[in-house]
Amino acid sequence: MQFHLIRKYASKVSREHYASSSVKIFRRVKPPQKVNKPKKPENVENGPTEYAENLVKVQMISRNLHAQLFPQAPRSISEQQVASAKVYKDELRRHGVDIESSAPVSDVQLKLPALRGANIEEHFHNIAKEQVQPYEELLLPLVQCEQLPKRPKRWAFHTGWTAYDPEDGTATPVDHPLEKGLVFDVEVCVSEGQAPVLATAVSTKRWYSWVSSKLTKHRLSVEKLEPLDVDTDSERPHYTTDELIPLGTTGPGLVVGHNVSYDRARLKEQYLTEDTGTRFVDTMSLHMCVSGVTSYQRAMLKSKKEPAAEDLGWLEQSSLNSLVEVHRLYCGGDTLSKEPRNIFVEGTLEQVRQSFQSLTNYCASDVEATHRILRVLYPLYAERFPHPASLAGMLEMGSAYLPVNSNWERYIREAQLTYEDLSIEAKYHLGRRAEEACSLLLDDQYRQNLWLWDEDWSVQELKLKQPPKRKPLPTVELKDSGNTPEERRLQAKFQHLYDQQALLPARRPLLPGYPLWYRKLCRKPPAKRADEILEDDEEPWSPGASEISTGMQIAPKLLSLCWEGYPLHYEREQGWGFLVPFRSDSEGVDRLPMEQLLAHCPVPEFARLSASKAESDMAFDMLPGQVEQHLGKREHYKKLSQKQQRLETQYQGSGVWCNKVLDDCCFFLKLPHKNGPSFRVGNPLSKDFLNKFAENVLSSGDPSCQAAARVIDIARMMSYWRNNRDRIMGQMVVWLDSQQLPNEFTGEKCQPIAYGAICPQVVACGTLTRRAMEPTWMTASNSRPDRLGSELRSMVQAPPGYRLVGADVDSQELWIASVLGDAYACGEHGATPLGWMTLSGSKSNGSDMHSITAKAVGISRDHAKVINYARIYGAGQLFAETLLRQFNPTFSASEAKAKAMKMFSITKGKRVYRLREEFHDELEDRAYSSYEASRLAIQRNRTLAEVFHRPNWQGGTESAMFNRLEEIATGSQPRTPFLGGRLSRALEADTGPEQEQRFLPTRINWVVQSGAVDFLHLMLVSMRWLMGSHVRFCLSFHDELRYLVKEELSPKAALAMHITNLMTRSFCVSRIGLQDLPMSVAFFSSVEVDTVLRKECTMDCKTPSNPHGLRIGYGIQPGQSLSVAEAIEKAGGNDVSQWDWIKKS
């Protein structure tokens, strides 16, 4: 049975396919003046004939490389191409692009291995097919197996693997399963840690079960590491390979599972340094490829409401990702029962023992369900993703491996101790502010405080018992009491206080005389005496506001925080906001300290002129400024009413109007939430607002409050560790004993430290766009001096004798989008303004895309970069407005709208309509605006689509790109441009004009993002072809790719990375009809060869938990950053075809 449908592409595409785009000019930018423009160098080594450039002055790859990569497409220039180039150059000049401004780069000469095919496209198909063939041979029998072997009636309860005879169910102990292709499921008893307790597997021949020794030997405690001391907290479990499941280490193996990365993390051989060849097929990832959903659709699937008619089509084509839902979608039948799982989640090991047979049957039923899903789902996947590189890339992504050593435990310990120290300091500062605020109770001074006026200042009195009515007892002075006369005098003086002890009530109030809000911050003193021993989990009691923290509602008030100068205030229904006065007098104001508010932030001029009651009724909705929380939702536009427009001129900050008035004297405006105006802010000291302090948008209104600045600094430092601590500390690290370590780890020169590994639980295709997902490592930030624990990635450290080699793909998505526009509109690299700026633009002279956009609109380059990428991903003008106001809160809504409109007119252009041919006789054949087209269609009583062709973008630097993206996205079966993968069925279903526009932003985003996934999969295939088994895949996140390789092979691996980039981009341009590649994108700017996982090999990763950096704190030296020329030199020459393993292949 053949599942891969191979599409043949012509090596040369007809020129008629690429129609020239007409571009309307909105403004002319003066070309940047180039001073001392360098001359094109003649390559000393290769000679002047190696240099090549195209008709728009974009430097192309060296001639020797072109001959090897595009052997059937010799370079030649026709008269028609020269004539077209004049048009392209004129358009580039009109958009302010100086094609003479780019500086050439040195040519590169390389002898590449021979292509495995007639051209680069056949080459990648053939090498990908070679890589997946061993696994397809194991996978296809499972897919074609209509009936699994009969499940055993009784499962053997003994340690290790047991095989069951398919005829009579006889149990036979085995070291590991005998077959290499398995459907597999693991169960874990959560209360006992992350190690597996039982597992089941099935092949086409027999069933297997595995039982942990903890289950059979009643050993309840998690084993501690004995061979090497990790020097760690004894409360945290540590795992060795003895607790994991062995699968064998010889030859290729295939494991199928649902969310199989969870099961993989419990397999013994996956933690060994050498790759075993076992790969994993995840039915959840296959489901995401075939029937994945947007975030909006996922919310609809979770909703219990009756779906709208327009949603019924895609609801039938998709589901949530759980095994139960996926099985229901593809297999139907009875719903799977998941009740036994509760014992694993909530129960104990003893309960698992008591229900061993039923729980093992539950595990086996999940295996059977996974197999049924595989039989239906894999043929769908193979049909929709025909290129073998897609499957090869998924298999490689599922083998991620992160080596660690004892420094991992040191990192966790240092980060946690620093976090606790900073927490104590923040608590101290807040406690001091709380104690100082209590003094406002005197003479009701709190009524004049702008932040604490609405807190509960009620106090409790200490009521003493009535003294008994009896005669005082005579005092008898003992001569030998030992007290001095002075002591006796003081005792007599204060005796009345000692006597009042008997008058205290049995149940004494907490802190009598203190306000209620303060008492809530304090703990009651314990009933135990001070000399009694505390329990292990009991904290010692301390007086004062010991329960206060930055996460409490009182904290922003104690710090006197302001937003844009206005005091913060909290309303239960609206969350955090701030007060803006609209009256200049305090008459009739009951509670609010109006005089102090007016002194702190005077009433705006507009309010002084019209301080009427009607002002409070004028509500306006700030222009949402966001495409949608999720691109799959329909966009809703709301016009501003006259009252709303009036209010917009009154307040020009970034607050969100919510029609709330306090004491008939001031407006309450909500703080802006990152998810939109319908959300409320729960804590202005959270990570989302920390940057606002640096911008002085959030600040303390009390100039004397030094504590506020320090608490804010501490909050900024703690946010990363607070949000990621549980995931980081919960990583399943498996430590290797000395017998499992290669000789390089245990030599005389090696330090006696522990070595282990983490198998990150990567979902190979976790999103609609097929991006991989993993909650810790794929979201890890780069280290920052003010971010506690952000050195996380650098704690992945290569063992002795190994190096981590990798690179960051430069502007991957931007290049993909621009080259699609170049090929579609011109058939020439860099012939569109966006294409030229991407390929030859330079940040240093301001000719790159982000610099030109920033200069034209009047914003910073960094902000322009974010908005540019958001636009390419499909976001609209409203989203750009929100970003502009988020970056610069001083922008008014009208200013942000004007800048966004200007940006979109310059970049995206104007949307125009062209008449269909049958209307040329009665109407002028020209470009019509949306309004004109709609009016003409209505006049003829026809739909827009009947009178006009699909609209196009015109006149912008990115018009050609968006026209091509929309053409792909609006097709009946959208496919990725490189590997031909299809869009999810959930977005293909019921594609009509309305549905098409509804999901268009998501579809455009899918074209770019899913194209980037194709690019990654091709890189993985190429690196495996060039380096074979000499590299082990570590991780890919964002646009970065990292491998583990032996130190002596690291220069060759670095050169292989450069060649991988060259060949992958060559394949991509060939698939869209271009037969050449620009030199600027042919190779990585640098490949990092390092001992730790960090973005740049020179980063020292200084953080609050690592103040001395890696060099001094850990003794880790900087790595090497190799250009292609340096990699060639260190690899021993430019003839890659002579590498030993390549010659043998």
UniProtKB/Swiss-Prot annotation:
Its cofactor is Mg(2+). Keywords: DNA replication, DNA-binding, DNA-directed DNA polymerase, Hydrolase, Magnesium, Mitochondrion, Nucleotidyltransferase, Transferase, Transit peptide. GO terms for cellular component: gamma DNA polymerase complex; mitochondrial matrix; mitochondrial nucleoid; mitochondrion. GO terms for biological process: DNA replication proofreading; DNA-templated DNA replication; mitochondrial DNA replication; sperm individualization; sperm mitochondrion organization. It is found in: Mitochondrion. It comes from the Eukaryota. Residues 1-9 form a transit peptide. Stimulated by KCl, and inhibited by the small molecules o 2',3'-dideoxythymidine 5'-triphosphate (d2TTP) and N-ethylmaleimide (NEM). Its main location: mitochondrion. Coiled coil: none annotated. It catalyses: DNA(n) + a 2'-deoxyribonucleoside 5'-triphosphate = DNA(n+1) + diphosphate. Optimum pH is 9.0. Changing W576A: Severe reduction in polymerase activity. Component of the DNA polymerase gamma complex consisting of two subunits: the catalytic subunit DNApol-gamma/DNApolG1 and the accessory subunit PolG2/DNApol-gamma35. As the catalytic component of the DNA polymerase gamma complex is involved in the replication of mitochondrial DNA (mtDNA). Has both 5'-3' DNA polymerase and a highly mispair-specific 3'-5' exonuclease activity. At the end of mtDNA replication DNA ends are ligated to produce a closed circular mtDNA molecule, its exonuclease activity is required for formation of these ligatable ends by preventing DNA synthesis from continuing past the 5'-end of downstream DNA into duplex DNA regions. This is DNA polymerase subunit gamma-1, mitochondrial. The gene is PolG1.
